[in-house]
Each structure stands twice: as structure tokens, then as C-alpha cells.
């Protein structure tokens, strides 16, 4: 959900997302796989795919980097929780997946959550 939001908001607003069944031989020609084992844009070094996309596309917005840290905590095993929003984000995204009829609907619904998270973090950063 977060990766799709990041791609559409900050890389390619016209991006289309395909969901390939596990074990399928390969992604269609021209498709960039992400968030799957072995993909260039996936989990690396204890960081989530969102983090990999921010790094790969050289996105310098500090709020996006903060969201990457939040998702790292929500999406990967962490010994210590630093980002207080991580567990809430994880719970909300799980609920969206459970109540959505398919992955594309979940992406659309999740975009509102990530828009709201981004806006709240921007507002919070202005106070500092």
C-alpha cells in the first residue's frame, strides 16, 4: 500500500499496478517488480521496500524518509520501537486489506491513509 502511494505521488502518477500470482515465471515486459523477494525494489538490509524506493529514486523529502522509518518498524522485525505511528499504521493497513475486495481497491483506500500520514508529519515538522 505504502509503496503504491509513494510511486503514484512522487514518481509516476500514472503508474499501473499488476498483481502476479506467486510462482509465476516473470513479470510482464516493461513491468518493474517490487516488494517481492529478489526484486531490486524490495526488502534489503532490514529495510522495507518503501525505503528501497526512496533511496533508488533519490527522493530527498525528509517526510518521506520519516515515513520509510515508520514503515520499516511496521513491516520488519525491530528490537526497539522508535516511531510511535508504526503499530497504528500496521493495524490500519491490515484492516484495509481485510475489508477490501481486492488489492487494487486496497491500494486506493490506503492512499488516503498515506496522504493523511504525510500531511500530519508535515504539520508536526512545522512546529519544530
Regions found by a protein language model. Name each.
Residues 1-81:
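Polyanion-binding interface signature
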Amino acid at each position: 500500500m505504502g509503496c503504491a502511494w509513494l510511486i503514484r505521488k512522487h514518481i509516476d502518477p500514472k503508474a499501473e499496478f499488476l498483481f502476479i500470482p506467486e510462482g509465476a515465471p516473470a513479470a510482464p515486459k516493461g513491468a518493474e517488480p517490487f516488494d517481492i523477494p529478489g526484486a531490486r525494489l524490495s526488502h534489503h538490509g532490514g529495510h522495507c521496500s518503501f525505503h528501497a524506493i526512496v533511496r533508488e529514486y533519490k527522493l530527498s523529502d525528509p517526510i518521506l524518509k520519516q515515513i520509510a522509518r515508520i514503515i520499516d518498524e511496521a513491516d520488519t522485525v525491530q528490537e526497539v520501537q522508535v516511531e510511535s505511528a508504526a503499530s497504528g499504521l500496521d493495524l490500519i493497513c491490515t484492516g484495509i486489506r481485510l475489508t477490501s475486495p481486492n488489492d487494487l481497491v486496497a491500494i486506493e483506500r490506503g492512499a488516503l491513509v498515506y496522504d493523511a500520514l504525510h500531511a500530519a508529519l508535515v504539520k508536526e515538522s512545522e512546529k519544530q
